[in-house]
Amino acid sequence: MNRWLMCLFGVAVTGVAVVVWSAEPGQPRETRKSPATKRAAKPVPLNPQGTVLLDRAGKRLLLKASVCARDRVLEMLCCLKRTKEHESILTIDASAAVVHAGLLALGARQGTPVRHYKEVSPGKLVADFKPPTGQQIEIYLQWKDKKGIPRRVRAQQWVRRATQRYFSAPLAKLPDGVVLPKEPELVFDVKNKELVWFGTMKPAQRDIFLKLSKDAVFRKAVGRLFGESQPTEMRAHWVFAGSGFIVDMQTKKKKYLAENGNLICVANFPSATLDIAQASSDKGSNLLYEAFIDRIPPVNTEVLIELIPKSRPVGKTSPPPPAKPRGLPR
């Protein structure tokens, strides 16, 4: 790890000094004592790009990012530049370790990343899911709309439950005399005993299916498919999971795992710096969330991300995840 980054981690833990990057190209950085009177000044850049800023007075960390996509199934809210833009809404030119250090400097409490397996004996792993933990981090997004008007929203408003996937509802059998239409296509899976539907069900489509039968169980299954397939804003909150380190076998240097791009995730990754406090698959076909396209400004729009550690203890307050996607039976 670079010497300046090690210094930054030390600063974050001790709180004695801050690393100040000059805005003038070519000028050297300097580390100096920071009097309390100066901590209420402008946010302090923590990296040479000036994209990560420590705002002690506002008790927040600021990230200068930009929109990289608006129509994706998501693994993350924000990735590092030139890493995972194909499955993220925002991207930032920064090091994940700098973001980690900035959160520590604000006093944020690091938790533990998600765990999918545990080792019960040398070389033997068994499934053992543990969700990510850590201090809750409130995330807000600031940008200017096409009229130049400043906007600010909670980050959850840009993420919704995935809709372009299959939904299912248990049903032992079709009511007598019911023949499902081919258009719109509602499928009864005889083997798994469930109704299956793809995508967002429109009210008119729901009404077509409800007219097929007065059977209460069938109508309940249709209602469930309709409800679960509607675009629904993400409700889960983010926590400071903290990623981890590995030692490069060739260089013998420590490497921060989130430098692979997993900065602010909505799918659980052991390498995530920030992750959501609920089970959320990291497998492509089972991803739970997608971009809320109607709410996101155009690609390349500059967005200021606010990371605000919450003072209240982190409890098991995240709602259960939405139903897991599944494919049609063969």
Cite the ranges covered by each PLM segment.
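Sec-dependent N-terminal signal peptides
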Residues: 1-22
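Basic polycationic patches enriched in arginine
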Residues: 3, 29-32, 326
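N-terminal low-complexity, Ser/Thr/acidic repeat segments characteristic of secreted
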Residues: 7-9, 23, 36, 40-43
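N-terminal compositionally biased, intrinsically disordered segments and leader/signal-like regions
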Residues: 15, 32, 37-38, 318
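Signal peptide processing junction and immediate N-terminal pro/mature segment
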Residues: 18-33
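Long, low-hydrophobicity ectodomains and other hydrophilic envelope-associated domains
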Residues: 38-330
